[in-house]
Amino acid sequence: MKPEEIERMRDEALAAFAAAGDLDALQEAKVAHTGGTSPLALANREIGALPPHAKAAAGKLVGQARGAVNKALGARQAELEAERDARVLVEEAVDVTLPYDRVPAGARHPLTTFMERVADVFVAMGYEIAEGPEVEAEWFNFDALNFTPDHPARQMQDTFFVEGPKGTEGDESGVVLRTHTSPVQARAMLDREPPVYIVCPGRVYRTDELDATHTPVFHQIELLAIDEGLTMADLKGTLDHMVQTLFGADMKTRLRPNYFPFTEPSAEMDMLCYVCKGESVGNPDRPCRTCSSEGWIELGGCGMVNPRVLTACGVDPEKYSGFAFGFGIERMLMFRHNVEDMRDMVEGDVRFTRPFGMEI
């Protein structure tokens, strides 16, 4: 094994690497000059057959040659990879100065935003969000809530009846589109052991014509609390907290006696007009469109849960008491943002939703 032969093998490998114009050609040269059948690999195997005194010198010579070959291979591979990457950047370059068609961002509907905001107030107080079916059994929608069989709300002119089992129709079907979210409360009392603290947002249906102040499909949010020792004071404090969180710490509320089948005693809750703060009452120089110069805005109905409702839903009225409250989201949104026509909320016109922001 002559030194000049080893040098020739090394030089041929270096020349082949330098001549490779791309990574594929370099791979072929690599196999030819560093693979198992390459000249340097064969020379390395022949070292074992040399006399002992010649092995060290031959091994050193072959090792130096193979080291130079591997170093040159790595350097050439790095060069070719850099050239490839630069070429790809040029070929796949994107001209960021070109104009493009802007896709407008969407906006959450203000009804959704406000309903979630109200629900968050109660969730922060420890209430749980509860949901139920919109196509509801008449028992949950009326009977469980102490609506008598002859109550006007159960008539077809006020309620959407759905075709029931075996083709029964009208008020004989026993199935309705829920007229309020109160059936969720009845289901919750039947499914859970007290204490129960829930808030129930959702869509409800009534046979109203779509006009500036009515819609047959609207949204309600109700809450229910069932526990030992609850009183009207707890209800008043809870609702005061909601109003002050949503409208400001200086907001005042009042309760007016009323009647609802599912609560006893019952009341309508009003809050001080957040626009005029009551200063428009008896003051023709400062009329207020929001409260019609009455100084108060009606929020919704509330009261202590009727013992008959507790009994129907499996709760012992001798041990537990509860309170409930509910109001319509659309009406409250009309007050908050001076929306004059409720149809704007349901027609899907982005010109209505966009100004409310909340882009996603």
Swiss-Prot record:
GO terms for molecular function: ATP binding; magnesium ion binding; phenylalanine-tRNA ligase activity; tRNA binding. It catalyses: tRNA(Phe) + L-phenylalanine + ATP = L-phenylalanyl-tRNA(Phe) + AMP + diphosphate + H(+). InterPro entries: aa-tRNA-synth_II, aa-tRNA-synth_II/BPL/LPL, Phe-tRNA-synth_IIc_asu, Phe-tRNA_ligase_II_N, Phe_tRNA_ligase_alpha1_bac, Phenylalanyl-tRNA_Synthase, tRNA-bd_arm. Mg(2+) binds at residue 264. PROSITE patterns: AA_TRNA_LIGASE_II. It comes from the Bacteria. It is found in: Cytoplasm. Its EC number is 6.1.1.20. Binds 2 magnesium ions per tetramer. CDD domains: PheRS_alpha_core. Belongs to the class-II aminoacyl-tRNA synthetase family. Phe-tRNA synthetase alpha subunit type 1 subfamily. HAMAP family: Phe_tRNA_synth_alpha1 (MF_00281). This is Phenylalanine--tRNA ligase alpha subunit. The lineage of its organism: Bacteria, Bacillati, Actinomycetota, Actinomycetes, Kitasatosporales. The gene is pheS.
